[in-house]
Amino acid sequence: MTMKRYIIGMMVLLLGLSVSAQTTYTKADSLTVCRLLKEAPAKASTLWFARQFHGVPYVAHTLEVNDREQLVVNTRQLDCTTLVETVTALTLCVKQEKRQWTDYLQALRILRYRQGVLNGYTSRLHYFTDWILDKQQMGLVEEIQRPNPPFTALQHINVNFMSQHPGSYKALKANPSLVKEIRQQEKALTGKTFRYIPKLAVKNTQLMRQTVKDGDIIAITCKKKGLEIAHLGFAVWQKDGLHLLNASQLHHKVVTEPMPLRQYLQKHSTHTGIRVIRIK
């Protein structure tokens, strides 16, 4: 019995070491994650975790720090995507009663890569629609597309931005052969349709409050050529309506936007509305 426990303990240790060996992080990152997992209430909400990152600087391209793809953990600098991934990973850890550093690494890897398998740059889910579909298939999230109204609009996916602008991506610029696989992924997404809430329907109504919940992931749809999602954040209901908690390029940090989301969307002519994703 003692030997069996020893073997199991060694397997867990080796698994943890294996995950850590393929990971880029600082001591500050691991301390932050471990502290949050320790301090989080038993039923900590998504917003509880999201609010812990208020004030963290907005920095883009934090995942592009290695020549070879590794799992990058950076809680000190966030963009809209890494904020959503970080908070979702923490939320899932607590939901599953897993509060160790290696649990978080596993959760983040499962979220960031196709079917949770890190296998080079193209295994990362670059288009958020791809992320939604993959994580929905894994039973981690659910995209809300009903009722109608407010989900009155239909988004027709037509993505090719990455394959058309490889020079804008460090890995594609350094490895042009990867563009072919990215293009295949784009073709697999193109033609799919999803219901969304048009921006004029994002109002402070009882129907909207019943449909969109605090902590839902908000994916802002857009009409920019080659892209389908412009920005990400979390839903926060306040007295004057729905707000967005996000890593803001404008504010240079993670904030809950002072203006309601309806007004925020109106200020951006390329924004068309919102898709809503709920963590299970």
Give short role names for the model-derived ranges.
Residues 58-195, 213, 237, 241, ...:
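Acidic/His-rich structured neighborhood in mature extracellular/periplasmic domains
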Residues 1-26:
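Bacterial Sec-dependent N-terminal signal peptides
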Residues 197-208, 222:
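Short alpha-helix capping/helix-loop boundary micro-motifs
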Residues 47-56:
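Glycine-rich, acidic and aromatic/proline-enriched surface loops and short helix-turn segments
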Residues 207-211, 227:
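Short, surface-exposed secondary-structure edge patches
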Residues 31-41:
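Active-site-proximal helix-loop elements at catalytic-domain edges
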Residues 216-280:
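C-terminal soluble interaction/assembly domains
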